Amino acid sequence: PIFGITNTHKDFAWLPQALESLISAEMWYPMITATVGHTYRQIVNKYYDLTCDDNVPRRRALGNFDFRGDMGVDAALKASAGWLLSFVNTATVPAIPFMKEMYNCDYSTEEVGFGAVSTEHFVMCSNSAIDIVNNPDDTYEYKDIDPMRERVFLKRLLTELYPNTSFSCVCDSYDYWNVVKNILPTLKDEILTHNGC
């Protein structure tokens, strides 16, 4: 157990269990996300040491995007606060003032958390339709909305929209493994020359 409360008075034998339940319910979720974040940070540190030859801040290596899928605003704030102990990228922007309140962070002078440039499923899916409408004479071989059409938008993200900043990209709108195995290898040059963080 993470903590224990011992009863010291026979008339209050019920109190420790009640308090333990309340405290555990409030602490468990942020502790889990803090532990996961810390574990991921150890992995990031290890592989940055082995593979990176630049000064990219390790605290910016990963981000959490759980706000929309969490169990409510309170849960999202606590989960993101746990994550922000190891990394600074979050889609749960309200967690930044929460960190100030709970951890006495001064986000005017220190890196507490940042929102990240990122795509969403809707953006990735609708871009194919927009691309087809805007380019009716396109000679691209995939004329219909097709998973391979994601390549067009991924290239645009890398070379036109965000050529000088890092961004997060949803890659599972159609077929995640198609993106990893087939699309990203064709964009190797664009990825390697991209001027992200």
Language-model features: locations:
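Buried, small/hydrophobic-residue-enriched core segments of structured protein domains
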Residues: F3-C197
